[in-house]
Design a protein with these regions (language model features):
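Solvent-exposed beta-hairpin/edge-strand motifs
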Residues: 168-183
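Conserved alpha/beta catalytic core and glycan-binding cleft of carbohydrate-active enzymes
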Residues: 1-92, 120, 130, 134-137, ...
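C-terminal beta-strand-rich structural cap/linker in extracellular carbohydrate-active enzymes
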Residues: 188-209
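Short hydrophobic/aromatic beta-strand or adjacent loop that forms the aromatic wall/cage
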Residues: 137-139, 149, 200-205
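Aromatic- and carboxylate-lined catalytic core of secreted/periplasmic carbohydrate-active enzymes
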Residues: 97-133
Length: 209
C-alpha cells in the first residue's frame, strides 16, 4: 500500500509520440477549471524520487520539470527535488533535507528558480490554450497561447542533438522565437520551425516575437 509504480500505466510511454498523446488525453478527462487547479507532481512522500528513478541524471529531471511548469495545472515541487535530493521507495523518499548548502546541486536549483520566474511572468504558461505541434520517437513540441502571447515548448529526450523542424501550427512564416532557457533562436519557414538544434537531453522554451 502506498507504492504507486503500477498506478495509471496507460499514461506512461517511452516514445515522444505516445507521451504527447497522453498529455493531450489528460486535458480532456476533467472540466478545464479542474484541470487548471490540479496538482501536478513528479514525485511525493509516497513514491521514489524522480531523480532516483531516472538513475540520478539531472538532465532528465530538468526535462520533466520543464513539462511540469509549462503544462496546465499547478506544479508542486517535493522538498529537495530542486537541489538534487534522491531516494527510493517510501520511507527512503522521505530523507531529511540537506541544510548544508555544499551538498546542493546549485545549477539545478537555479534552473527551478528560472522556471518559476518564467511561469509567474507569463500567464500563457499558466492558463493558455494547449496545442500539440509535433512529435517523434524522442522529441515533442507543444504551444501555449493566450491573448496573442505564444510560447513553444520543445523536449529532446534523445542522446543526440535534435534539429527542430516540427510544424509551427498557428505561427506565421517569418516568426522569430527566442529560447528563454538560453539556447538561441528559431524561426518559422514554410510552416515549420527551423534554425535551432537542441543538445541531447535538453529542452527549449521559445517565446514568439
Amino acid at each position: 500500500v502506498g507504492h504507486w509504480e503500477g498506478h495509471g500505466p496507460q499514461y506512461f510511454s517511452t516514445s515522444g509520440t505516445g507521451f504527447l498523446a497522453n498529455l493531450e488525453k489528460l486535458l480532456h478527462l476533467y472540466p478545464m477549471p479542474a484541470v487548471l487547479a490540479q496538482l501536478n507532481l513528479l514525485d511525493s512522500h509516497d513514491t521514489a524520487r524522480f531523480l532516483s528513478i531516472t538513475g540520478g541524471d539531472p538532465r532528465l529531471l530538468k526535462l520533466a520539470t520543464l513539462v511540469q511548469f509549462t503544462y496546465p495545472g499547478a506544479p508542486s515541487i517535493y522538498y529537495g527535488d530542486e537541489v538534487g535530493v534522491e531516494g527510493g521507495q517510501d520511507p527512503d523518499c522521505r530523507r531529511s533535507f540537506p541544510w548544508d548548502e555544499s551538498r546542493w546541486d546549485h545549477k539545478l536549483r537555479s534552473y527551478f528558480q528560472l522556471l518559476i520566474r518564467l511561469r509567474l511572468a507569463h500567464p500563457a504558461l499558466r492558463t493558455g490554450e494547449f496545442i500539440p505541434l509535433g512529435s517523434s520517437e524522442d522529441a515533442v513540441a507543444y504551444l501555449r497561447r493566450l491573448d496573442g502571447a505564444c510560447f513553444v515548448i520543445v523536449i529532446n529526450n534523445s542522446d543526440a542533438p535534435f534539429h527542430i523542424t516540427f510544424p509551427a501550427g498557428p505561427l506565421a512564416d517569418g516568426t522569430v522565437l527566442q529560447d528563454l532557457l538560453g539556447k538561441g533562436t528559431a524561426r518559422v519557414e514554410n510552416g515549420n520551425f527551423a534554425g535551432l538544434a537542441l543538445p541531447p537531453r535538453t529542452g527549449a522554451l521559445l517565446q514568439a516575437g
